[in-house]
Regions:
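Membrane-anchoring hydrophobic helices of lipid-metabolizing enzymes
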Residues: 1-78
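Short histidine/acidic/glycine/proline-rich micro-motifs that form metal-
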Residues: 36-37, 111, 162-163
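Hydrophobic alpha-helical segments typical of transmembrane helices
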Residues: 50, 89-92, 116, 174, ...
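Catalytic core of membrane glycerolipid acyltransferases/transacylases, capturing the structured
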Residues: 57, 72-133
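Generic preference for hydrophobic
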Residues: 64, 80, 105-106, 211-213
Length: 242
């Protein structure tokens, strides 16, 4: 179901998203020049402007804890792992990141169907993941590693789908392969309250969202046994702040 309905808020939200994709000429110029740092900063600028403008349109407010745990750009790339309650989780993660750096996403394949969303995926250095397709999963792992090796951050929602409520589902074991393959640290993040925005009642509603950034987990320094233990610990850490 499309959460955006006809009316002023839909139009304003669409315009704000178009403002991000309108930067495509600048993105292409930076890519052609091989200016990775410039591209990362342009993504951050576009995402910050989008989330700061879209937030009042959607009626969202935020309460952020642990912001000091978000790595600075000079600390290198990382992956953000978060629970997934709602469509609005994108807003929550971008709000957390807006003063710290850009964020790409492991996105569902269905977004390709919508030109404006496909442009957002393309120009935010996000990647697609086709669920329940092992061959495509291997391809996505390679693409994610490439992005992270270049210095772009990535976010993944390890539950694989929205819980649409306060409760958190089980994490997919394969989700941790992204950070393990790229040898980057994980920032565990808990998001709570986004399901009030739409999923709870099936209509657009104001929502107060609590965002908790937990200490960074350096799985890139761990052996296989330690990484497996860390996976369970990360999942429990995220669940503990709900």
């Amino acid at each position: 179901m499309n959460i955006f309905k006809t009316g002023p808020r839909f139009i304003r939200g669409y315009i704000e998203t178009m403002r991000f994709t309108a930067l495509k000429k600048q993105f292409r110029k930076l890519r052609e020049a091989g200016d990775i740092e410039g591209e990362k900063e342009l993504i951050r600028f576009g995402q910050k402007r989008w989330v700061e403008n879209i937030t009042p349109i959607l009626g969202l407010t935020y309460e952020v804890h642990g912001e000091e745990n978000v790595p600075a750009p000079e600390d290198g790339p990382f992956m953000l792992y978060s629970n997934h309650q709602s469509f609005a989780d994108i807003c929550a993660t971008l709000w957390l990141m807006k003063d710290h750096g850009m964020m790409g996403y492991v996105s569902k394949e269905e977004w390709r169907k919508y030109p404006i969303l496909a442009d957002v995926v393309e120009y935010s250095r996000s990647i697609y993941l086709i669920r329940n397709n092992p061959k495509e999963a291997v391809k996505a792992l390679g693409e994610a590693k490439k992005m992270l090796d270049m210095g772009f951050n990535l976010c993944i929602f390890p539950e694989g789908t929205r819980s649409q409520c306060h409760e958190m589902g089980e994490f997919k074991a394969g989700a941790f392969k992204f950070a393990e393959k790229a040898k980057v640290p994980i920032l565990p993040v808990t998001i709570d309250g986004t399901y009030h925005f739409f999923e709870e009642k099936g209509t657009w509603n104001p929502a107060h969202i609590k965002i908790t950034a937990h200490p960074l987990v350096h799985i890139e320094t761990m052996d296989k046994h330690e990484q497996k233990e860390a996976q369970a610990a990360i999942e429990e850490t995220i669940r503990s702040a709900l």
